[in-house]
A protein has these predicted regions:
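The AdoMet/dcAdoMet-binding core of the Class I SAM-like
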Residues: 1-132, 136-138, 257, 265
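Soluble small-group transferase modules, centered on the S-adenosyl donor enzyme superfamily
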Residues: 1-8, 64-67, 72, 122, ...
Length: 268
């Protein structure tokens, strides 16, 4: 995100994510954390990692539920970043449902970006497809990065989000070399917007594969991922790579046919 006036972090954790944004020169940083004890313990035991970011002059702490915070104020952000606990924890799915993403859109600037951690392990393939497709219902451009075994969803409705930027926010020119860190980040892209678009097509009726406050699909489905007998991480990676490769084949006119849900979903 080249525009770095203000950002919101939902979930403090160890505080490292908030520190990264602070160190990358966001002018203002808001943090919404449900538990004051989390912040106190993180600063006590991980202060050398988070740099006590919660105490910085340009950082405001809000001890409240992240979704309620967005609901009860009208600030708009350049970036909203979320790295919560696993979806299957009670209540966490409220920040992965369609209504939440609708709310997030109203709290982002027109060129704003949502960044959200998503687990790839202990996640049944169909549940992961639900999650990605739910986000895509509200955001035109969606990427999935997998770095260090962790998934990160990046979403925006701005055409400018498809441009490539350096970590310092400057645009990548044709003759500009990426740093080694930036190259590793680019190598971590597992699904591009074209791949996510193709995913929606394979679902036949994408509006059905959506988790909402009314059906609570992710709330009740994701806990079952802890009991599967197969390697969910490996199967999910393979499924998503297959989707992305098929999407690329269609773009270059070299596809033998669509991958339908029954062929991309593993045991669930």
């Amino acid at each position: 995100q080249p525009k770095r006036e203000n950002a919101l972090v939902i979930g403090y954790g160890t505080g490292n994510s908030a520190r990264v944004l602070h160190d990358h020169d966001f002018a203002r940083l808001d943090i919404a954390e449900l538990s004051p004890d989390i912040v106190a313990l993180a600063n006590k035991h991980f202060g050398d990692i988070n740099g006590l970011v919660s105490q910085k002059d340009n950082v405001d702490m809000y001890y409240t539920d992240g979704r309620n915070y967005l609901l009860t104020q009208s600030k708009r952000y350049d970036l909203i970043s979320m790295e919560l606990t696993s979806i299957w924890f009670a209540g966490a799915a409220n920040l992965y449902n369609r209504e939440f993403y609708q709310l997030v859109k109203t709290r982002l600037h027109d060129d704003g970006i949502l960044q959200q951690w998503v687990q790839i392990h202990h996640m049944r393939p169909m549940d992961l497809l639900y999650l990605i497709n739910t986000l895509h219902q509200e955001f035109r451009y969606v990427w999935l990065y997998v770095i260090g075994g962790q998934g990160i969803l990046v979403a925006s409705n701005a055409d400018s989000a498809t441009n490539l930027y350096h970590l310092d926010g400057t645009a990548v020119a044709g003759d500009t070399m990426l740093t080694e860190t930036e190259k590793r980040l680019q190598e971590g892209v597992l699904l591009t917007p074209e791949g996510v678009d193709y995913l929606a097509q394979t679902l036949r009726n994408p509006t059905f594969f959506v988790s909402t406050d009314n059906n609570l699909y992710l709330e009740y489905a994701t806990p079952k991922g802890n009991a599967v007998s197969y390697d969910a991480f490996a199967i999910n990676i393979g499924m998503l790579e297959k989707l992305q490769n098929e999407a690329k084949a269609i773009l270059i006119g070299d596809s033998e046919g669509q991958i339908m849900p029954e062929s991309i979903t593993a045991p669930h």
